[in-house]
Amino acid sequence: MSAQAQPEAVTSFRAMRMQDLDAVMAIELRAYPFPWTVGIFRDCLGAGYQAWLALVGERIVGYGVLSIAAREAHVLNVCVDPAEQGQGIGRQILRMLLRCARHHGAERIFLEVRPSNPHAIALYS
């Protein structure tokens, strides 16, 4: 009988902070051919957007960014470290963002997906 590694589930979420941006950018650069800039993340945090880190223990494995205004939420970014993809972490992040949107009174939630991002299309389908 062989032992197989079990996928790691997110153990907690916490709000993203400015001091997390180096780690966030490292994941962003590994994950996307056209990544957000650190300035975009700074602007999101400065504007008070909901920005959350997904953690396994103390290790950042992904994040999500959500804007909420006028009872509408817009999922701006969901990212999982490529080394951690395929374990359901993106789905956990998306569910957390949906709960956050509802908690803040959003009645509608929008997101856009690039046709070149099959992982996201599969997640949102």
How would you label these PLM feature ranges?
Residues 2-3, 124:
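The identity of the second residue at the extreme N-terminus of proteins
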Residues 3-7, 12-87, 91-104:
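Acetyl-CoA-dependent GNAT
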Residues 30, 114-116:
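Short beta->alpha junction loops/turns
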Residues 80, 113-114:
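Aromatic-flanked redox-active Cys/Sec active sites in thiol-based oxidoreductases
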Residues 87, 91, 107, 116-125:
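Conserved active-site alpha-helix within GNAT-family acetyltransferase domains
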